[in-house]
Swiss-Prot record:
The record marks S151, R158, K160, T161, Y254 as: Part of the allosteric site. This is Glucosamine-6-phosphate deaminase. Its EC number is 3.5.99.6. GO terms for molecular function: glucosamine-6-phosphate deaminase activity; identical protein binding. Allosterically activated by N-acetylglucosamine 6-phosphate (GlcNAc6P). Keywords: Allosteric enzyme, Carbohydrate metabolism, Hydrolase.
Length: 266
């Protein structure tokens, strides 16, 4: 596992965006051989999306031959709802870059047959072979996507019940009322994420410090689903200074020295 210790949220977003652009450009995608990118929603990746849009407008990257798969979607929320992840992605990213509409894959939380929708999504991912890079965030309780504590580490795309803690955390997008946050969501599984060639998790804020500590220094534990990334051959944690507060000083020092050449010019 790599840990990229940076100073603040802005640097986390910039580093993550630069890493994605480097990966896409090194891959040299074509229509017949697209780059497959997994994407999250929420507050944490906002800076990364801003930088990706800026780099696209500067001519540094094209998303014409990029295929995306989003991590999750609320169940029962109309896709036109301002807080649906469909709306979030189009407002904050897709509408500002050159990605073709047919290359965008989002879970349908209003599907008549939820189980069939989850199977369809898994099969669509498999049809491309694998996701080359999956960017994500982490919850206060260590959840990745909507894989809440006690999720199976072998799980696939499915419906999940959201914990009260997650609904309270997401209530900031619903006028502060947790009762307006849907109780269920469709989410890629832990196993789905582990199948990706590379997984990059963005961690910002003191509130995520315990989750980061569990991911990096703790044991693999289904109560901290983020810890599953210790099993991944190519996992990266990109974090700001407040989120490292629960890590041992020597852990942060070790990774800071190890990644010194990779955090220049931020």
């Amino acid at each position: 596992m790599r840990l990229i210790p940076l100073r603040n949220t802005a640097e986390v977003g910039k580093w993550a965006a630069r890493h994605i652009v480097n990966r896409i450009n090194a891959f040299k995608p074509t229509a017949e051989r697209p780059f497959i990118l997994g994407l999250p929603t929420g507050g944490t990746p906002m800076e990364a999306y801003k930088h990706l849009i800026a780099m696209h407008k500067a001519g540094e990257v094209s998303f014409k031959h990029v295929v995306t798969f989003n991590m999750d979607e609320y169940v029962g929320l109309p896709k036109e709802h301002p807080e649906s992840y469909y709306t979030f992605m189009h407002t904050n990213f897709f509408d500002h870059v050159d990605i073709p509409a047919e290359n965008i894959n989002l879970l349908n939380g209003n599907a008549a047959d939820i189980d069939a929708e989850c199977r369809r999504y898994e099969e669509k991912i498999k049809s491309y072979g694998k996701i080359h890079l999956f960017m994500g965030g982490v919850g206060v309780d260590g959840h990745i996507a909507f894989n809440e504590p006690a999720s199976s580490l072998a799980s696939r795309t499915r419906i999940k019940t959201l914990t009260q803690e997650t609904r309270i955390a997401n209530s900031r997008f619903f006028g502060g009322d947790a009762n307006l946050v849907p109780k269920y969501a469709l989410t890629v599984g832990v196993g789905t994420l582990l199948d990706a060639e590379e997984v990059m998790i963005l961690v910002t804020g003191h509130g995520k410090a315990q989750a980061l500590q569990a991911a990096v220094e703790g044991s693999i534990n289904h109560m901290w689903t983020i810890s599953c990334l210790q099993l991944h051959a190519k996992a990266i944690m990109v974090c700001d200074e407040p989120s490292t507060m629960e890590l041992k000083v020597k852990t942060v020092k070790y990774f800071r020295e190890l990644e010194a050449e990779n955090v220049k010019d931020l």
